[in-house]
């Protein structure tokens, strides 16, 4: 079995068996956005009142984040895709390493804990192995707000400086438009004293979703979605009910899968302007895109090569670079894919070449000559988006493919294979019962088998 990383090995606890040369047809329901839900869970720490989150996807990352909040003292009740969170009895301001390991989003807790309680201890974050994602912007921004920060033995220890009880609003200019830093600083500044301005802020839809929920809670945040965000700190925040926005990355993945298989599908619900960079490139490459309300329909017969360069929103999302590389690998003509966000996000290239692609990699640029077909293989995905790219490749390929490393896929796609089945793809999840024995959390294509969040 070929592994997505030459330096790592993965337990083959679960894999997907894909019968190739499939076509997609029908309507697929898009789940709530993982990257939004994770930060909204952290934001619930900012109030003592109840927060109700709707449209929360059932994913291993969400379960990990919920367990982190429970450990802090948050009471969580789940029903279907709805979470009720009660943070009034938080007694711990420290996140244990064993719970945060592998979940980068755990670091979001530092802003709310510091701003609300004046102290926080959070391990350095983990996540997908796609290169360096430093937290310098988070740390420098929190220091500017009045935090004293010490990093010892991979633990970030933060306190409010001196005898002050609150962070103090200030002007912060980010060196780069970091999504995580923007979100961390917005949450921290929402309970700070005075006005905070964040320049060169990230503009991603998930940030806008966070600001919308915080404003429902009583925050005073202006101009989210713009390069300069203004936050007037308030004394306290209240509870609210909020629906997580649709996942634009999941939506884009299905659109790309449809284009790669010359298929026609409709995705819904979506927010079309969140997907503009993707749909524009799909249209440029030969797909017909029809937008109607909160749905997008794609029809595709022939694909031609087009160039893309990843960029912060509203540019082409880095999270869809790997799936789009798969599409370009079977397009007519040549194309060039340039990754500008992460330095190690081309793990899929040598695997696609094993399947028959013709891709030459020069640092962060993939030069692609389209081929007519792929051949099915047994492969292991090394990260979340590589796994999605390989599944699309398996659907295109002649013969059968087996994709392992599903612990990555299950972090970011809710019931991915069952949705593909609904669209007509022959795909089966296989379990290694011996390995699964000690697993606390698993995802199944059968909704009845999906573990519920326990009431705490």
UniProtKB/Swiss-Prot annotation:
Modified residues (2-(S-cysteinyl)pyruvic acid O-phosphothioketal): 128
Residues holding phosphoenolpyruvate: 34-35
SUPFAM superfamilies named among the record's database cross-references: EPT/RTPC-like
Localization terms from the record: Cytoplasm
Enzyme class: transferase
Pathway: Cell wall biogenesis; peptidoglycan biosynthesis
One of the protein's GO biological processes: regulation of cell shape
Catalytic activity: phosphoenolpyruvate + UDP-N-acetyl-alpha-D-glucosamine = UDP-N-acetyl-3-O-(1-carboxyvinyl)-alpha-D-glucosamine + phosphate
GO molecular function terms noted in the UniProt entry: UDP-N-acetylglucosamine 1-carboxyvinyltransferase activity
Entry's EC annotation: 2.5.1.7
The entry's keywords: Cell cycle, Cell division, Cell shape, Cell wall biogenesis/degradation, Cytoplasm, Peptidoglycan synthesis, Pyruvate, Transferase
Principal place of residence: cytoplasm
Annotated catalytic residues: 128
InterPro entries on file: Enolpyruvate_Tfrase_dom, Enolpyruvate_Tfrase_sf, MurA_subfamily, RNA3'P_cycl/enolpyr_Trfase_a/b, UDP_GlcNAc_COvinyl_MurA
PANTHER family noted in UniProt: UDP-N-ACETYLGLUCOSAMINE 1-CARBOXYVINYLTRANSFERASE
Function: Cell wall formation. Adds enolpyruvyl to UDP-N-acetylglucosamine.
Protein family membership: Belongs to the EPSP synthase family. MurA subfamily.
Name of the protein this chain belongs to: UDP-N-acetylglucosamine 1-carboxyvinyltransferase
Originating species: Prochlorococcus marinus (strain MIT 9301)
Phylogenetic placement of the source organism: Bacteria, Bacillati, Cyanobacteriota, Cyanophyceae, Synechococcales
